[in-house]
Amino acid sequence: MMNRSYDDFMKEYDPKVQPLMDSLRKFCFSLGSNVVEDIRMHRVVFCKSFAFRWFVYVEPQNDSVLLKIQKSRRETQTVELALDEDLDKTQELIREAYNTIH
């Protein structure tokens, strides 16, 4: 199967979740030049390239976005973000996860 692009992936979801997905994606890429995006069937996974260790899964829902954030090798945290929710706390969690991966 061909690797789908992010845009192709997003066509399958309600357009109203696109701005939130775009913001989260932009934030993940802003963390470092080594961030790699892996488009899966129902989610977008962000990894650190050299280890290909994921730090966050981002999965669009109907009117929210579900995130699974890697806190440590054994611990993940699930966050459901409403479309109008403030991103600051979630971005901090994602940044911590990114910085924790070695």
Task: Outline where the language-model segments fall.
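Charge-dense, helix-prone N-terminal extensions
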Residues: 1-102
